[in-house]
Amino acid sequence: MLMTEDRLTHLKQLEAESIHIIREVAAEFENPVMLYSIGKDSAVMLHLALKAFYPAKLPFPLLHVDTGWKFKDMIAFRDNMAKTHGFDLIVHQNKEGREAGINPFDHGSSKYTDIMKTQGLKQALDKYQFDAAFGGARRDEEKSRAKERVYSFRDTKHRWDPKNQRPELWSLYNGKVNKGESIRVFPLSNWTELDIWQYIYLENIQIVPLYFSAVRPVVERSGTLIMVDDERMRLKEGEVPQMKSVRFRTLGCYPLTGAVESEADTLPEIIQEMLLATSSERQGRMIDHDEAGSMEKKKQEGYF
């Protein structure tokens, strides 16, 4: 008996929708790429892509825009995943930004993010001439992402115009682009944070250990717990790292990512904690709080 849509669980419906989108992009575009930020959403998106083309190899590479300030655990996890699954991994860093010493301490989160993330991403997309790029953004994360299409059109400068988006009826997507233009594709658009965690649990998906609670060295700044991940962390006068049981709901560059105090060190405990949470997972991402509407402005400039 065929399993009709109304007999599928909501997670299986989401899975089927995402796999359809991933296969559609692989068939429709000449040179797609999957952006790999190493977080939980990237882990789910990669898992779905591997499912979509199993037992064949992924028909597109993964791209990680490395700022040089990611958690050590993230880089180790990235390299291990590439080795385990054998996918093509492109690691790109803004060479000019690195040589200029751009960092989150001296230059602030806004300028640092623009140069090392946004400009770095645009450099990589131009260098390899990708015409479609998968991203792991979800509509429930943040208000600017809530109004973005699954197929998000970008012009030749990689800019997004929220007032000029293409209609998407049912499961029909318009991927037509001219030379130099591209599409950002978000297969997880309709997933929620809870969906992501439940799917990780049910599918036994590997994720970075930072998502699980452990005793880690942190300093508190403006109510945010920042983990001291290496010797480059600049401590303020009189500031001493404290060992606390913390975990991360979202991952980014370690000087700009806040931890939460938690004892949740298993997936069921994380899911239970998430159900009781009253704040967004991106509350710990300092780049989201640069100014009002900062995420939408970043996306208009070419950010993920």
Curated annotation (Swiss-Prot):
Alphabetized InterPro entries for the sequence: PAPS_reduct_dom, Rossmann-like_a/b/a_fold, SO4_adenylTrfase_ssu, Sulfate_adenylyltrnsfr_sub2
EC numbers for this chain: 2.7.7.4
Protein's recorded name: Sulfate adenylyltransferase subunit 2
Annotated catalysed reactions: sulfate + ATP + H(+) = adenosine 5'-phosphosulfate + diphosphate
Family designation: Belongs to the PAPS reductase family. CysD subfamily.
Record flagged with keyword Nucleotidyltransferase: yes
GO molecular function: ATP binding; sulfate adenylyltransferase (ATP) activity
Any Pfam family hit: PAPS_reduct
Function, as annotated: With CysN forms the ATP sulfurylase (ATPS) that catalyzes the adenylation of sulfate producing adenosine 5'-phosphosulfate (APS) and diphosphate, the first enzymatic step in sulfur assimilation pathway. APS synthesis involves the formation of a high-energy phosphoric-sulfuric acid anhydride bond driven by GTP hydrolysis by CysN coupled to ATP hydrolysis by CysD.
GO biological process, one term: hydrogen sulfide biosynthetic process
Entry keyword annotation includes Transferase: yes
Superkingdom per UniProt: Bacteria
Biological or metabolic pathway of the protein: Sulfur metabolism; hydrogen sulfide biosynthesis; sulfite from sulfate: step 1/3
SUPFAM superfamilies given in the database record: Adenine nucleotide alpha hydrolases-like (SSF52402)
CDD domains hit by this protein: Sulfate_adenylyltransferase_2
Species annotation: Acinetobacter baylyi (strain ATCC 33305 / BD413 / ADP1)
Complexes and interactors: Heterodimer composed of CysD, the smaller subunit, and CysN.
Keywords noted in UniProt: ATP-binding, Nucleotide-binding, Nucleotidyltransferase, Transferase
